[in-house]
Amino acid sequence: MVARFSGASDVVRVVALLQFGSAVPLGIFAATVYARQLRLGIRVPGPAIGLFGGILASVMLMASSLVIWVLSRPEVTVDAVLTHALAFLAFVTGGVGYVVGMGLLVAGIAVPALILGLMPRWLAWTGLVIAALSELAYLSMVIEPLVVLLPVGRFGGGIWLIAAGFLLPVSRAAANRRNGA
């Protein structure tokens, strides 16, 4: 573990920088979708749950990247136990913490979209499955084989958010046109 971080400290530092940078647009996306849902007249808890999840995912990703940055410091990686502990902290914040937040963000968009017909039903249902698997990923903290759910939430959730961002109507009039009203 020490060799991985101390042998490539410049690369680790760049990874931390890029990961931190990716957390900012996620938070902006969550706020933008929240505002769009309110503009669409959605007055149920879903938008607030999604906003909370998006902020949580963004903050967890930032925290993970800051810990990774600390791991790029040669004065830290001289201590093998500390390096190992910080690597676990980076993993749990950037893995479980991020994916649980991502699942809430996806659910906060998918549930109202399904109920109100704001996107194709298959896409909304796919979002619900991704959200459920993302929430179950927290069990990987005690049932280690469930870490396989982390990439489902991370990559599946990211792909789903891109699709939802394009398909979620920008106004009530657009939603009505889509639904034939």
Model-derived features with residue positions:
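Hydrophobic, aromatic-enriched alpha-helical segments typical of multi-pass transmembrane helices
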Residues: M1-A181
